[in-house]
Amino acid sequence: LSEPCFALLVIFLLGVIFNADSTFFKWTTHRDMLRQSSVYGILACGMTLVIITAGIDLSVGSILGFTAVMFAILSIYQEWSPWLSIPACCLMGTLLGIISGVFIARFRIQPFIATLAMMVFARGMAKLVSSGMKVSPWFQQSDGTSIYREPSIFGFLDSNILQGNLAMVTLIFAICLLVSWIILSRLRIGRYIYAVGGNEEAARFSGVPVVLTKIFAYGMCGLFSAIAGICQAAQEHQGDPEAGTFYELSAIAIVVIGGTSLMGGRGGILLTLIGTLTIGYLEKILSINAVGESSRLLLTGVIIITAVLLQKRRK
Protein backbone atom coordinates (compact mmCIF):
# COMPACT_ATOMS: atom_id res chain seq x y z
CA LEU A 1 0.00 0.00 0.00
CA SER A 2 1.55 3.32 -1.09
CA GLU A 3 2.05 6.13 1.41
CA PRO A 4 -0.65 8.43 -0.11
CA CYS A 5 -3.19 5.58 -0.09
CA PHE A 6 -2.23 4.72 3.48
CA ALA A 7 -2.72 8.36 4.54
CA LEU A 8 -6.17 8.42 2.90
CA LEU A 9 -7.11 5.17 4.63
CA VAL A 10 -5.99 6.48 8.03
CA ILE A 11 -7.98 9.71 7.66
CA PHE A 12 -11.04 7.77 6.51
CA LEU A 13 -10.81 5.50 9.56
CA LEU A 14 -10.44 8.54 11.81
CA GLY A 15 -13.67 9.83 10.33
CA VAL A 16 -15.40 6.60 11.27
CA ILE A 17 -13.93 6.55 14.79
CA PHE A 18 -14.58 10.18 15.74
CA ASN A 19 -18.16 10.43 14.49
CA ALA A 20 -20.26 8.49 16.94
CA ASP A 21 -23.49 10.03 15.62
CA SER A 22 -22.97 8.17 12.32
CA THR A 23 -22.84 11.42 10.31
CA PHE A 24 -19.82 10.07 8.49
CA PHE A 25 -21.77 7.04 7.27
CA LYS A 26 -24.36 9.12 5.41
CA TRP A 27 -23.83 9.47 1.65
CA THR A 28 -24.75 13.15 1.83
CA THR A 29 -21.61 13.70 3.92
CA HIS A 30 -19.41 12.24 1.18
CA ARG A 31 -21.38 14.00 -1.56
CA ASP A 32 -20.91 17.35 0.16
CA MET A 33 -17.22 16.63 0.75
CA LEU A 34 -16.75 15.93 -2.96
CA ARG A 35 -18.67 19.09 -3.86
CA GLN A 36 -16.51 21.22 -1.57
CA SER A 37 -13.26 19.63 -2.78
CA SER A 38 -13.97 19.60 -6.51
CA VAL A 39 -12.88 23.17 -7.29
CA TYR A 40 -9.57 22.55 -5.50
CA GLY A 41 -9.25 19.24 -7.33
CA ILE A 42 -9.77 20.89 -10.72
CA LEU A 43 -7.01 23.37 -9.91
CA ALA A 44 -4.80 20.49 -8.76
CA CYS A 45 -5.21 18.74 -12.13
CA GLY A 46 -3.48 21.65 -13.84
CA MET A 47 -0.97 22.03 -11.04
CA THR A 48 -0.01 18.36 -11.45
CA LEU A 49 1.00 18.90 -15.07
CA VAL A 50 3.11 21.91 -14.12
CA ILE A 51 4.78 20.31 -11.10
CA ILE A 52 5.73 17.20 -13.09
CA THR A 53 7.67 19.55 -15.42
CA ALA A 54 9.55 20.70 -12.27
CA GLY A 55 7.63 23.98 -12.29
CA ILE A 56 5.11 25.72 -10.07
CA ASP A 57 2.12 27.98 -10.76
CA LEU A 58 1.15 30.54 -8.14
CA SER A 59 -1.39 32.23 -10.41
CA VAL A 60 -4.12 29.57 -10.44
CA GLY A 61 -6.17 31.21 -7.68
CA SER A 62 -6.04 34.63 -9.31
CA ILE A 63 -6.94 33.23 -12.73
CA LEU A 64 -9.86 31.50 -11.03
CA GLY A 65 -10.98 34.84 -9.58
CA PHE A 66 -10.63 36.65 -12.91
CA THR A 67 -12.54 34.05 -14.91
CA ALA A 68 -15.22 33.83 -12.20
CA VAL A 69 -15.80 37.57 -12.53
CA MET A 70 -15.76 37.46 -16.33
CA PHE A 71 -18.17 34.52 -16.40
CA ALA A 72 -20.56 36.44 -14.13
CA ILE A 73 -20.28 39.61 -16.22
CA LEU A 74 -20.86 37.80 -19.51
CA SER A 75 -23.70 35.69 -18.13
CA ILE A 76 -25.50 38.27 -15.96
CA TYR A 77 -24.82 41.69 -17.49
CA GLN A 78 -24.14 40.81 -21.13
CA GLU A 79 -26.63 37.91 -21.13
CA TRP A 80 -24.37 35.72 -23.24
CA SER A 81 -25.36 32.15 -23.92
CA PRO A 82 -23.38 29.54 -21.94
CA TRP A 83 -22.22 28.22 -25.31
CA LEU A 84 -20.33 31.51 -25.72
CA SER A 85 -19.48 32.59 -22.17
CA ILE A 86 -17.94 29.29 -21.06
CA PRO A 87 -15.58 28.91 -24.08
CA ALA A 88 -14.67 32.61 -23.82
CA CYS A 89 -13.67 32.27 -20.16
CA CYS A 90 -11.78 29.04 -20.85
CA LEU A 91 -9.88 30.82 -23.63
CA MET A 92 -9.01 33.70 -21.29
CA GLY A 93 -7.63 31.34 -18.67
CA THR A 94 -5.68 29.35 -21.25
CA LEU A 95 -4.12 32.50 -22.70
CA LEU A 96 -3.01 33.69 -19.26
CA GLY A 97 -1.44 30.29 -18.64
CA ILE A 98 0.28 30.36 -22.02
CA ILE A 99 1.71 33.81 -21.27
CA SER A 100 3.24 32.45 -18.06
CA GLY A 101 4.58 29.47 -19.99
CA VAL A 102 6.19 31.70 -22.62
CA PHE A 103 7.98 33.78 -19.99
CA ILE A 104 9.19 30.62 -18.24
CA ALA A 105 10.16 28.51 -21.26
CA ARG A 106 11.23 31.13 -23.80
CA PHE A 107 12.69 33.86 -21.60
CA ARG A 108 14.00 31.50 -18.89
CA ILE A 109 12.31 33.36 -16.03
CA GLN A 110 11.96 31.30 -12.86
CA PRO A 111 8.45 29.78 -12.58
CA PHE A 112 8.02 31.25 -9.10
CA ILE A 113 8.69 34.80 -10.34
CA ALA A 114 6.74 34.52 -13.61
CA THR A 115 3.63 33.03 -12.02
CA LEU A 116 3.85 35.42 -9.06
CA ALA A 117 3.68 38.28 -11.56
CA MET A 118 0.74 36.62 -13.31
CA MET A 119 -0.96 36.12 -9.94
CA VAL A 120 -0.81 39.86 -9.25
CA PHE A 121 -1.82 40.75 -12.84
CA ALA A 122 -4.84 38.42 -12.95
CA ARG A 123 -6.05 39.57 -9.53
CA GLY A 124 -5.70 43.17 -10.66
CA MET A 125 -7.68 42.43 -13.82
CA ALA A 126 -10.43 40.79 -11.76
CA LYS A 127 -10.76 43.91 -9.62
CA LEU A 128 -10.50 46.23 -12.63
CA VAL A 129 -13.29 44.68 -14.71
CA SER A 130 -15.56 44.38 -11.65
CA SER A 131 -14.64 47.78 -10.16
CA GLY A 132 -13.70 45.84 -7.05
CA MET A 133 -17.32 44.80 -6.48
CA LYS A 134 -19.01 41.42 -6.54
CA VAL A 135 -20.92 40.79 -9.77
CA SER A 136 -24.34 39.79 -8.48
CA PRO A 137 -27.65 38.87 -10.19
CA TRP A 138 -29.44 41.53 -8.11
CA PHE A 139 -30.62 44.48 -10.23
CA GLN A 140 -31.80 47.88 -8.97
CA GLN A 141 -34.94 49.13 -10.72
CA SER A 142 -35.96 52.75 -11.33
CA ASP A 143 -38.61 52.61 -8.59
CA GLY A 144 -35.98 51.66 -6.01
CA THR A 145 -36.90 47.98 -5.75
CA SER A 146 -34.51 45.15 -6.54
CA ILE A 147 -35.06 42.05 -8.64
CA TYR A 148 -33.06 38.84 -8.74
CA ARG A 149 -32.31 37.61 -12.25
CA GLU A 150 -29.89 34.69 -12.17
CA PRO A 151 -28.76 32.96 -15.38
CA SER A 152 -30.00 29.38 -15.62
CA ILE A 153 -26.43 28.14 -16.17
CA PHE A 154 -25.60 29.07 -12.56
CA GLY A 155 -28.32 26.82 -11.23
CA PHE A 156 -27.35 24.04 -13.63
CA LEU A 157 -23.68 24.03 -12.62
CA ASP A 158 -24.60 24.21 -8.93
CA SER A 159 -27.15 21.40 -9.14
CA ASN A 160 -27.05 17.75 -8.12
CA ILE A 161 -27.50 14.95 -10.63
CA LEU A 162 -28.28 11.23 -10.39
CA GLN A 163 -31.30 11.88 -8.19
CA GLY A 164 -29.35 14.26 -5.99
CA ASN A 165 -26.52 11.83 -5.28
CA LEU A 166 -23.75 13.66 -7.14
CA ALA A 167 -22.93 17.33 -7.58
CA MET A 168 -22.47 18.63 -11.12
CA VAL A 169 -19.14 20.20 -10.12
CA THR A 170 -17.94 16.76 -9.02
CA LEU A 171 -18.76 15.38 -12.46
CA ILE A 172 -16.77 18.24 -14.01
CA PHE A 173 -13.87 17.38 -11.70
CA ALA A 174 -14.07 13.75 -12.84
CA ILE A 175 -13.92 14.87 -16.48
CA CYS A 176 -10.86 17.02 -15.73
CA LEU A 177 -9.21 14.02 -14.05
CA LEU A 178 -9.92 11.88 -17.11
CA VAL A 179 -8.53 14.49 -19.52
CA SER A 180 -5.39 14.89 -17.40
CA TRP A 181 -4.93 11.12 -17.19
CA ILE A 182 -5.22 10.79 -20.97
CA ILE A 183 -2.65 13.57 -21.45
CA LEU A 184 -0.13 12.02 -19.07
CA SER A 185 -0.70 8.34 -19.83
CA ARG A 186 -1.85 8.05 -23.42
CA LEU A 187 -0.44 10.98 -25.39
CA ARG A 188 3.09 11.77 -26.54
CA ILE A 189 2.96 15.17 -24.87
CA GLY A 190 2.56 13.33 -21.56
CA ARG A 191 5.86 11.52 -22.10
CA TYR A 192 7.43 14.86 -22.94
CA ILE A 193 6.12 16.36 -19.68
CA TYR A 194 7.73 13.58 -17.64
CA ALA A 195 10.96 13.84 -19.64
CA VAL A 196 11.25 17.60 -19.14
CA GLY A 197 10.66 17.26 -15.41
CA GLY A 198 13.06 14.36 -15.03
CA ASN A 199 16.03 15.93 -16.82
CA GLU A 200 15.43 18.98 -18.98
CA GLU A 201 18.82 18.99 -20.68
CA ALA A 202 18.68 15.29 -21.50
CA ALA A 203 15.16 15.76 -22.86
CA ARG A 204 16.34 18.63 -25.07
CA PHE A 205 19.23 16.56 -26.46
CA SER A 206 16.77 13.72 -27.11
CA GLY A 207 14.69 15.94 -29.36
CA VAL A 208 11.90 16.76 -26.92
CA PRO A 209 10.37 20.20 -27.68
CA VAL A 210 11.03 21.53 -24.19
CA VAL A 211 9.71 25.05 -24.80
CA LEU A 212 6.42 23.90 -26.33
CA THR A 213 5.99 21.24 -23.64
CA LYS A 214 6.28 23.78 -20.84
CA ILE A 215 3.97 26.22 -22.60
CA PHE A 216 1.44 23.42 -23.05
CA ALA A 217 1.60 22.50 -19.35
CA TYR A 218 1.05 26.07 -18.19
CA GLY A 219 -1.66 26.62 -20.80
CA MET A 220 -3.53 23.56 -19.54
CA CYS A 221 -3.08 24.80 -15.98
CA GLY A 222 -4.68 28.09 -17.02
CA LEU A 223 -7.54 26.22 -18.68
CA PHE A 224 -8.26 24.16 -15.57
CA SER A 225 -8.11 27.35 -13.49
CA ALA A 226 -10.75 28.90 -15.75
CA ILE A 227 -12.98 25.84 -15.42
CA ALA A 228 -12.61 26.07 -11.64
CA GLY A 229 -13.48 29.78 -11.82
CA ILE A 230 -16.67 29.06 -13.76
CA CYS A 231 -17.68 26.43 -11.19
CA GLN A 232 -16.83 28.78 -8.32
CA ALA A 233 -19.00 31.57 -9.76
CA ALA A 234 -21.90 29.15 -10.20
CA GLN A 235 -21.55 27.81 -6.64
CA GLU A 236 -21.43 31.31 -5.14
CA HIS A 237 -24.10 32.63 -7.57
CA GLN A 238 -21.91 35.66 -8.23
CA GLY A 239 -18.52 36.71 -9.49
CA ASP A 240 -16.22 37.69 -6.63
CA PRO A 241 -12.92 39.42 -7.54
CA GLU A 242 -11.45 37.99 -4.33
CA ALA A 243 -12.45 34.41 -5.22
CA GLY A 244 -9.60 31.92 -5.28
CA THR A 245 -7.39 33.78 -2.80
CA PHE A 246 -4.77 31.31 -1.48
CA TYR A 247 -6.34 28.49 -3.53
CA GLU A 248 -2.95 27.96 -5.17
CA LEU A 249 -1.66 26.77 -1.79
CA SER A 250 -4.45 24.22 -1.52
CA ALA A 251 -3.77 22.98 -5.05
CA ILE A 252 -0.06 22.57 -4.33
CA ALA A 253 -0.87 20.81 -1.04
CA ILE A 254 -3.15 18.34 -2.82
CA VAL A 255 -0.48 17.49 -5.40
CA VAL A 256 2.28 17.12 -2.80
CA ILE A 257 0.18 15.07 -0.37
CA GLY A 258 -0.84 12.85 -3.28
CA GLY A 259 2.80 11.98 -3.83
CA THR A 260 3.82 13.89 -6.96
CA SER A 261 7.42 15.03 -6.58
CA LEU A 262 8.08 18.76 -6.34
CA MET A 263 11.39 18.07 -8.08
CA GLY A 264 9.54 16.99 -11.21
CA GLY A 265 9.58 13.89 -13.37
CA ARG A 266 7.50 11.70 -11.06
CA GLY A 267 3.84 11.60 -10.11
CA GLY A 268 0.47 11.19 -11.74
CA ILE A 269 -3.13 12.28 -11.85
CA LEU A 270 -4.39 9.33 -9.81
CA LEU A 271 -2.13 10.51 -7.00
CA THR A 272 -3.77 13.91 -7.30
CA LEU A 273 -7.17 12.27 -6.85
CA ILE A 274 -5.88 10.60 -3.67
CA GLY A 275 -4.54 13.96 -2.47
CA THR A 276 -7.89 15.64 -3.15
CA LEU A 277 -9.78 12.98 -1.21
CA THR A 278 -7.26 13.11 1.65
CA ILE A 279 -7.56 16.88 2.07
CA GLY A 280 -11.32 16.75 1.50
CA TYR A 281 -11.95 14.10 4.13
CA LEU A 282 -9.59 15.78 6.57
CA GLU A 283 -11.45 19.09 6.20
CA LYS A 284 -14.83 17.36 6.53
CA ILE A 285 -13.86 15.38 9.63
CA LEU A 286 -12.47 18.47 11.35
CA SER A 287 -15.56 20.47 10.36
CA ILE A 288 -17.95 17.82 11.70
CA ASN A 289 -16.03 17.82 14.99
CA ALA A 290 -16.19 21.63 15.18
CA VAL A 291 -12.42 22.10 14.96
CA GLY A 292 -11.53 25.76 14.38
CA GLU A 293 -10.06 27.03 11.12
CA SER A 294 -6.72 27.91 12.71
CA SER A 295 -6.28 24.35 13.98
CA ARG A 296 -7.26 22.95 10.59
CA LEU A 297 -4.64 25.11 8.86
CA LEU A 298 -1.99 24.03 11.35
CA LEU A 299 -2.81 20.35 10.85
CA THR A 300 -2.82 20.72 7.07
CA GLY A 301 0.60 22.38 7.24
CA VAL A 302 1.97 19.52 9.34
CA ILE A 303 0.64 16.99 6.82
CA ILE A 304 2.27 18.85 3.91
CA ILE A 305 5.66 18.95 5.67
CA THR A 306 5.33 15.24 6.49
CA ALA A 307 4.52 14.44 2.86
CA VAL A 308 7.58 16.35 1.62
CA LEU A 309 9.85 14.62 4.15
CA LEU A 310 8.51 11.22 3.07
CA GLN A 311 9.22 12.14 -0.56
CA LYS A 312 12.81 13.04 0.31
CA ARG A 313 13.29 9.79 2.22
CA ARG A 314 11.83 7.75 -0.65
CA LYS A 315 14.08 9.54 -3.13
Model-inferred region functions:
Residues E79-M119, I274-G275:
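Alpha-helical transmembrane segments within multi-pass membrane transporters and channels
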